[in-house]
Amino acid sequence: MIDVIMTGELLKTVTRAIVALVSEARIHFLEKGLHSRAVDPANVAMVIVDIPKDSFEVYNIDEEKTIGVDMDRIFDISKSISTKDLVELIVEDESTLKVKFGSVEYKVALIDPSAIRKEPRIPELELPAKIVMDAGEFKKAIAAADKISDQVIFRSDKEGFRIEAKGDVDSIVFHMTETELIEFNGGEARSMFSVDYLKEFCKVAGSGDLLTIHLGTNYPVRLVFELVGGRAKVEYILAPRIESE
């Protein structure tokens, strides 16, 4: 049996993070907490979600268990939940997930985990540049770039970290120096990425959330968000766009 209680804010954050890429997911209730990971149908991006046991108000599991969840359905339900609500998730059998908050109880049919696409292996990436910044600033930069182009260049060197977008007639550069960043190692890297994916990723975060970017040259980027006051970690890995000569 699974019986856990979490804040509405935590549930909304997790569901938003996962539905950015997939509509169904395997959710693992482990001794150390909740874990999920999935790759989008185009094999361009991966999401990895971890919520430590201590981030829950209550975390009771008889044994480690994996369930298959219709994340779109849970996301729809989460729209009715306030960030301050306490939400209880109960799994008593293989077929049903109960979602309880206030005087409301939803019963959601579970999916056979084996019917959900196999979970991806997390790639081992040696990426030279590490940038730590406020997620809200990153979100503003991506929103601005979206008005110019459908792709952006992330660039890191000793001068700082830049996000660049160029359209037919307009261009934009977002630049933060080492002193403006929370942490920066000055590593040299440059890659191009899809704005559409980045916009979806940004929806989980806001001002005050922490974002760590691990960047290489023509390599996937790792975007690690520390959310809900550090109680949840959401990581996205996004493949680069190959630039034409």
Curated annotation (Swiss-Prot):
Entry similarity comment: Belongs to the PCNA family.
Its protein name is DNA polymerase sliding clamp
What keyword terms does UniProt attach to this protein?
DNA replication, DNA-binding
Q: What does this protein do?
A: Sliding clamp subunit that acts as a moving platform for DNA processing. Responsible for tethering the catalytic subunit of DNA polymerase and other proteins to DNA during high-speed replication.
The domain of life is Archaea
What organism is listed for this UniProt entry?
Archaeoglobus fulgidus (strain ATCC 49558 / DSM 4304 / JCM 9628 / NBRC 100126 / VC-16)
The family database entries (InterPro entries) matched by this protein are listed as: DNA_clamp_sf, Pr_cel_nuc_antig, Pr_cel_nuc_antig_C, Pr_cel_nuc_antig_CS, Pr_cel_nuc_antig_N
Transmembrane segment boundaries? none
Q: What quaternary structure, including any partners, is listed in this protein's UniProt entry? A: Homotrimer. The subunits circularize to form a toroid; DNA passes through its center. Replication factor C (RFC) is required to load the toroid on the DNA.
A molecular function annotated in GO for this UniProt entry is: DNA polymerase processivity factor activity
* One record GO biological process: regulation of DNA replication
